From Swiss-Prot:
InterPro entries: Claudin (IPR006187), Claudin1 (IPR003548), Claudin_CS (IPR017974), PMP22/EMP/MP20/Claudin (IPR004031). PANTHER family: CLAUDIN. Claudins function as major constituents of the tight junction complexes that regulate the permeability of epithelia. While some claudin family members play essential roles in the formation of impermeable barriers, others mediate the permeability to ions and small molecules. Often, several claudin family members are coexpressed and interact with each other, and this determines the overall permeability. CLDN1 is required to prevent the paracellular diffusion of small molecules through tight junctions in the epidermis and is required for the normal barrier function of the skin. This is Claudin-1. It is a multi-pass membrane protein. It comes from the Eukaryota.
Length: 211
């Protein structure tokens, strides 16, 4: 029988990772303005996300501008958007599939083997979801690093990692860990050998041997 505690732990971790991926996708702080130069004025903070760019003044006023043109966006941003949305949708599917296969649920109690397969299948989908989120955040982060160390990039146009990017990395890790625990909650099949049956001994001959 599947380990109910391991299943529940994996599901909770993966679910938290899915929530984190939604938060990361919605937040505009994927990259924040770098203050590496001493000549940069710190009266305002500039940051960008997947859907908008914002400017926060020292007075507390925040102004955001949504990216209107899809074709005007660079390929990295478009790919990151697509991978994050795919990861969120896959995570939603994994939640429904894994819920059916959980030991604590009453669904499919008459078919224990099918119930375990559903839990493992949900874990596999969580793994794919976490991988998509990890690729998206790593790709976007690599682009930030390349632009930061590019000598052609002006000092006043360099960005660093934002909070949303760290949340995305944490979300991907939780989805991968939770999916792996769900997959490991399925017990290994034990090979059963047939019980040997005793053969009847031949009855002793009562007749005499003749030459």
């Amino acid at each position: 029988m599947a380990n109910a505690g391991l299943q529940l732990l994996g599901f909770i971790l993966a679910f938290l990772g899915w929530i984190g991926s939604i938060v990361s996708t919605a937040l505009p702080q994927w990259k924040v303005y770098s203050y590496a130069s001493d000549n940069i004025v710190t009266a305002q903070a500039i940051y960008e996300g997947l859907w908008m760019s914002c400017v926060s003044q020292s007075t507390g006023q925040i102004q955001c501008k949504v990216f209107d043109s899809l074709l005007n966006l660079n390929s990295t941003l478009q790919a990151t958007r697509a991978l994050m949305v795919i990861g969120i949708l896959l995570g939603l599917i994994a939640i429904f599939v894994a819920t059916v296969g959980m030991k604590c649920m009453k669904c499919m109690e008459d078919d224990e083997a099918q119930k375990m397969r559903m839990a493992v299948f949900g874990g596999v989908i969580f793994l794919i979801s976490g991988l998509a989120i990890l690729v998206a955040t790593a790709w976007y982060g690599n682009r930030i690093v390349q632009e930061f160390y590019d000598p052609m990039t002006p000092v006043n146009a360099r960005y660093e990692f934002g909070q949303a990017l760290f949340i995305g990395w944490a979300a991907a890790s939780l989805c991968l860990l939770g999916g792996a625990l769900l997959c490991c909650s399925c017990p290994r099949k034990t090979t059963s050998y047939p019980t040997p049956r005793p053969y009847p001994k031949p009855a002793p001959s009562s007749g005499k041997d003749y030459v």
